Amino acid sequence: MATSVGDGKNTRWNELCKITKIVLEVGTIFDSNGVDLFFLNRPASLRIKNARDVDKAFVSAPSGYTPLAAALRYIIRLPAAKRGNDKKLLLFIATDGEPTDEEGNPDLPEFENVMYNERNPETTHVMFLICTDEPGCVEYFAKWDRTMKNVDVTDDFRTERATIRQYRGCDYPFSLGDYVIKALIGAVDPTIDALNEPIEVNDD
């Protein structure tokens, strides 16, 4: 995803990498066991415990297809995602396109099946960090944000701020720090999750 943002010197993919690295770095502070980073087309980096290791993991540029269903299925079958584990799993999925299978064929129904029917929403919270303008992708991510329990979707900073101000008012304060907080806990805190959604009106 090479779409330019802001002053044109940055791309949405670079922004996504930056926010993902921030999320990982914060995660290493709050989880003494470290955080696990799974890539779709190369080996995982497990038990990352400091910012230097985060930087090393992102040296190689992304390549290949987007087999999200297979990757998610593998992760939610790990012991950390099982009911009864002493900690819940907060899963961040950073993506810039439509899910495919390992051969590159569109695979959205299978990914949706894993999210709805195989993921346990009580033990596995999912935070999507996306950078795409494809109408189909935007539509199904927005639907999942509204209908799936313990799931939140966050776009790049400028798009997210514009969406929030569309519903909350043009002067609604939303800084880069607020963006990082939403990216971190949107799938855990319903109030944060709802920031980029229409305000519900109670007719009572």
Which residues does each predicted region cover?
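VWA/integrin I-like adhesion module and closely mimicked acidic/polar interface patches used
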Residues: 98-154
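Von Willebrand factor
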Residues: 45-47, 51-88, 99, 131-139
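P/S/T/G-enriched low-complexity
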Residues: 134-204
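Well-ordered, non-membrane alpha-helical segments in soluble/globular domains
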Residues: 13-20, 69-73, 104-115
